[in-house]
């Protein structure tokens, strides 16, 4: 909490480093978008596969889209959080930790550059810029993958039937809630990664130890936020009662 407060106080200073914010945003997109989008497409394919073979036995293959619609706001944010924790969170610990033990952070302070603003706050702002783009495209690819497989590969349902069921069990409000949940996970993951990287000590061994700690804590954060958000946003849905 103390570290988070320091980050918030340093955010106004980060406005002086717009180019660094954009650079970090570009790095996040280039290095993380492919794996995030690929796994969300896999999730969409899995939803269509399970939906087809399970519901076909019950004579309800027309409702295959239920699996994708619920997956968008239930499994989707968790998958996003786990990937972000492994790819981005651990990367931040390694990057900032190596800078700490090689005294690069101390050198920034000596030069009069606020290390928290330049190294941490800029990354927080970058993740705020990048996450909506990654999430919207990821959820779109998840829907598109399931849509194509269900209609043209498994022949479970027609295009109109698929879209009708999908939007019956998922509204724009559900989508925005899923994005908000994912962004909350992302901010928490980046803060944890920056904390363990910024405070690393003990040489390369210490950096490795902090990387492992950050991954464990981020997995807990994703699980806790996921459970709370499911009950808060979707637990009372009469059309798709989850958690009741």
Predicted regions span which residues?
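Active-site cofactor/substrate anionic-group-binding motifs, chiefly glycine-
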Residues: 24-79, 83
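A hydrophobic alpha-helix feature that marks transmembrane segments and, especially
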Residues: 82-100
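Short, membrane-interfacial amphipathic segments enriched in basic
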Residues: 1-19, 196-201
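Generic alpha-helical transmembrane segments of integral inner-membrane proteins
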Residues: 37-41, 45, 128, 132, ...
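Membrane-interfacial helix-loop-helix connectors in multipass membrane proteins
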Residues: 50-73, 137, 141-183, 192-210, ...
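Selective transmembrane-helix segments that form parts of the transport pathway or gating/packing helices
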Residues: 29, 33, 37, 84-88, ...
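Short cytoplasmic-facing helical segments at TM-TM junctions of multi-pass membrane proteins
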Residues: 96-121, 204-207
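Hydrophobic, aromatic-rich alpha-helical transmembrane segments
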Residues: 17, 21, 25, 29, ...
